[in-house]
Amino acid sequence: FDIMGLIKKVAGAL
């Protein structure tokens, strides 16, 4: 599970 990848995806969606 890519935690950093998920965070970056959410940050980019904001």
Swiss-Prot record:
Keyword terms: Amidation, Antibiotic, Antimicrobial, Cytolysis, Fungicide, G-protein coupled receptor impairing toxin, Immunity, Innate immunity, Mast cell degranulation, Membrane, Secreted, Target cell membrane, Target membrane, Toxin
Modified residues (Leucine amide): L14
Broad class of where this protein is predominantly found: secreted
Gene Ontology molecular function: any one: toxin activity
Location of this chain's protein in the cell: Secreted; Target cell membrane
GO terms, biological process: defense response to bacterium; defense response to fungus; innate immune response; killing of cells of another organism
Tissue: Expressed by the venom gland.
GO cellular component, one term: other organism cell membrane
UniProt record similarity statement: Belongs to the MCD family. Mastoparan subfamily.
Function field: Linear cationic alpha-helical peptide with antimicrobial activities against both Gram-positive and Gram-negative strains and against the yeast C.albicans. Shows moderate mast cell degranulation and leishmanicidal activities. Has a very low hemolytic activity. Its mast cell degranulation activity may be related to the activation of G-protein coupled receptors in mast cells as well as interaction with other proteins located in cell endosomal membranes in the mast cells.
Name under which the protein is recorded: Eumenine mastoparan-ER
Lineage per the UniProt record: Eukaryota, Metazoa, Ecdysozoa, Arthropoda, Hexapoda
